[in-house]
């Protein structure tokens, strides 16, 4: 039986980020598996609103790798990038004749993990 692969992974989480899960996942799918520098450049030029909180969580994951594990940022790649559904904020929009329509403002939880490139 082969030896298990041991590696150090640094994680960062962003909780209750405004935005739908599907809109965040379309950005995370493009940066998963890329190097840290390449992902930052891609996020800078993408035209989506969700890139700002994703960049913040990515920088936090790299800072965790530097501080907690002593890893070099130039050798890091993104091996885990997930978005899970968070709680929904319920709001009501007044409508005609005393009615009210419910509006759900969605949030999501972003998790990013980085490892060293081998």
From Swiss-Prot:
It is found in: Plastid, Organellar chromatophore. The keyword RNA-binding applies. Keywords: Organellar chromatophore, Plastid, Ribonucleoprotein, Ribosomal protein, RNA-binding, rRNA-binding. GO terms for molecular function: rRNA binding; structural constituent of ribosome. SUPFAM superfamilies: Ribosomal protein L22. The keyword Flavoprotein does not apply. One of its GO terms (cellular component) is plastid. Its main location: plastid. One of its GO terms (biological process) is translation. Belongs to the universal ribosomal protein uL22 family. This protein binds specifically to 23S rRNA. The globular domain of the protein is located near the polypeptide exit tunnel on the outside of the subunit, while an extended beta-hairpin is found that lines the wall of the exit tunnel in the center of the 70S ribosome. Part of the 50S ribosomal subunit. This is Large ribosomal subunit protein uL22c. It comes from Paulinella chromatophora. The gene is rpl22.
């Amino acid at each position: 039986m082969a030896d298990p692969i041991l590696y150090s992974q640094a994680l960062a989480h962003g909780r209750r980020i405004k935005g739908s899960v599907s809109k965040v996942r379309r950005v995370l799918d493009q940066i998963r598996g890329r190097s840290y520098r390449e992902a930052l450049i891609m996020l800078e030029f993408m035209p989506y609103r969700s890139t700002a909180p994703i960049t913040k969580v990515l920088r936090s994951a790299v800072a965790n790798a530097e501080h907690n594990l002593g890893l070099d940022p130039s050798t890091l790649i993104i091996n885990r990038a997930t978005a899970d559904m968070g709680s929904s904020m319920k709001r009501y929009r007044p409508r005609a004749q005393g009615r009210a329509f419910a509006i759900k403002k969605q949030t999501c939880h972003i998790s990013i993990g980085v490892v060293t490139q081998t």
